[in-house]
């Protein structure tokens, strides 16, 4: 009888109720807790949503010591609004999330152009890894600024 592979062993460990991780990040509004006066934090789904949003809005060379991290969507916003441009925008967002956000399992990205307001409505659908959750939707409005 063959022995289980390492992937199956790791998957069984990840599905175990003993392996529950809590993802946390700093609250970027820097709101102080009323009792301890510490900076509050965001956890789990909210932390991953904030990280995905930051990755979408981050340009290359904006993160110190990591010039490779960034989506580069600002350059696309100045291109003519066509279905091809919307597809390229969605593809760049998919790439940055798949490469730099290990806490999210991406389901899909939709970029819908709003020609009247010169903006894109980008919807990112993903699951938060460990603990598995329901489908998370993140909608970001992208518009060009001069």
What is each residue range found by the language model?
Residues 1-91, 95, 107, 112-146:
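Immediate N-terminus of the mature polypeptide
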